A protein has these predicted regions:
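N-terminal signal peptide c-region/cleavage motif recognized by signal peptidases
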Residues: 17-20
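Bacterial N-terminal signal peptides that target proteins for export
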Residues: 1-10
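Short, linear, compositionally biased motifs with a strong N-terminal bias
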Residues: 13-14
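Short Cys/His-rich "knuckle" micro-motifs
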Residues: 145-146
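Extracytoplasmic c-type cytochrome modules immediately beyond a signal peptide or single-pass transmembrane anchor
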Residues: 24-129
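The canonical Cys-X-X-Cys-His
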Residues: 130-141
């Protein structure tokens, strides 16, 4: 049986159009990068490196709140990835990891609430709590660059 001449290019095109499946570690990294992209502009304001615009800051805080929990759903039991910086302690100490997640989500909610008040001192304080929460989790559960 002979395949039509145009079938091979069509199959190649079909293969290229299929999404590339990312590893669990890559998916988590992409999700955390979204958080970082939402968080960084607020940091410029919190450190007086960018002007404070209340409506814009509220949108940024809300965007962060909407995506904050997403990466944590990707730490499934069989998702250890050799390329990832995720430490094995995530899976061996799940209660501690869950506590860090909750601290982060609570801090993000508080930042969102502070943003709505327009009180820049409260915003800066809340931003610092979120940043500290990130650091605390990274110190315990994120390994060095590979």
């Amino acid at each position: 049986m002979t395949l039509p001449k145009n079938l091979a290019p069509a199959l190649a095109l079909l293969a290229l159009s299929l999404p590339v499946l990312a590893s669990p570690g890559e998916e988590r990294q992409q999700s955390f990068k979204k958080i970082l992209r939402a968080f960084e502009p607020m940091g410029l304001v919190a450190r007086d490196r960018a002007p404070y615009r209340k409506d814009e800051f509220i949108k940024q805080a809300d965007a962060l709140k909407q995506i904050a929990a997403a990466p944590f759903t990707l730490f499934t039991p069989n998702s250890i990835d050799a390329k990832s910086r995720a430490k094995p302690e995530i899976w061996s100490q799940p209660e501690k990891f869950k506590t860090e997640q909750q601290k982060f989500l609570t801090a993000v909610n508080e930042l969102d609430s502070a943003a709505k008040t327009g009180d820049i001192a409260s915003i800066k304080r809340s931003y610092g709590v979120v940043a500290q929460s990130c650091k605390s989790c990274h110190d315990s559960f994120r390994g060095p660059e590979k």
